[in-house]
Amino acid sequence: QFNEYGHMRF
């Protein structure tokens, strides 16, 4: 899943 920054979120 990607957060509002476009980085991986676990």
Swiss-Prot record:
Keywords (A to Z) from UniProt: Amidation, Neuropeptide, Oxidation, Pyrrolidone carboxylic acid, Secreted
A GO BP term here is: neuropeptide signaling pathway
Modification note: Occurs in two forms, Rhopr-SK-1 contains unmodified Met-8 and Ox-Rhopr-SK-1 has oxidation at Met-8.
- GO cellular component annotations of the record: extracellular region
UniProt xrefs under Pfam families: Sulfakinin (PF08257)
Q: Which residues carry this modification: Methionine sulfoxide?
A: 8
Instruction: Point out residues bearing the modification Phenylalanine amide.
Output: 10
Q: From which domain of life does this come?
A: Eukaryota
The record ties this protein, via InterPro entries, to: Gastrin/cholecystokinin_CS (IPR013152), Sulfakinin (IPR013259)
Hey, which family's this protein in? Answer: Belongs to the gastrin/cholecystokinin family.
Q: What is this protein called?
A: Sulfakinin-1
Recite the lineage of the species. Eukaryota, Metazoa, Ecdysozoa, Arthropoda, Hexapoda
